[in-house]
């Protein structure tokens, strides 16, 4: 489970480098625990009460159809309710119950963890963030197992959807990633304790800044001459 955040380390003007001292080792995610995604999926389904109940109902209705096939009314009613149950079951399986991970407190927890750790693109920081989010959902009763996100890639994709369309704070014109992003003192996150009044929009903007900086650093590492290429296009 995630340790309490150190409020003094969470500042809006610290976007430069990932916080290496916050990266924890030996964190096992579902993709490390299960042999395949199928085995993980079966494990999750077997422990999801609504799915188990619907599966049991469908099984009972199918047995009624088999053993009372000479009773047209029984067969018709059983087939009708089995069909409805199957439709609901497929909706649940396809939906993935996103409402459980759309609550503001969970999104805030994810944003604060990203702000604290400043993960790089494809960085190992995402492993501990994913582990923390899985534990958070389970410990707070928002998911039935501590394995909601199968991998760090899944958690990262969820984060990207969260900050999609969010415009980070405007900066002065510079070449890509040459200078750290600074913010006004009043934007600093004074405290990240559960009792504090969290400014969700502030966290969202800050996390979007960090992701933008991480993307720029990623592409600069892959293409060291990117500044020269950009100057040619000006």
Swiss-Prot record:
Residues 231-234 are annotated as: COPI binding. Residues 1-47, 94-234 are cytoplasmic. The keyword Lyase does not apply. It is found in: Endoplasmic reticulum; Golgi apparatus; Cytoplasmic vesicle, COPI-coated vesicle membrane; Cytoplasmic vesicle, COPII-coated vesicle membrane. Its main location: endoplasmic reticulum. Residues 69-72 are extracellular. The keyword Endoplasmic reticulum applies. The modification Phosphothreonine is found at residue 3. One of its GO terms (cellular component) is endoplasmic reticulum. It is a multi-pass membrane protein. GO terms for biological process: endoplasmic reticulum to Golgi vesicle-mediated transport; protein transport; retrograde vesicle-mediated transport, Golgi to endoplasmic reticulum; vesicle organization. The chain crosses the membrane at residues 48-68, 73-93. Keywords: Cytoplasmic vesicle, Endoplasmic reticulum, ER-Golgi transport, Golgi apparatus, Membrane, Phosphoprotein, Protein transport, Transmembrane, Transmembrane helix, Transport. It holds the Pfam family DUP. Involved in protein trafficking vesicle formation, probably by stabilizing of coatomer at the Golgi membrane and thus allowing the efficient formation of COPI coated vesicles. Interacts with MST28. Binds to coatomer proteins of COPI and SEC23/SEC24 of COPII coated vesicles. Members of the DUP240 multigene family are specific to S.cerevisiae sensu strictu. Cells lacking all 10 DUP240 proteins show no obvious alterations in mating, sporulation and cell growth. Belongs to the DUP/COS family. This is Multicopy suppressor of SEC21 protein 27. The gene is MST27.
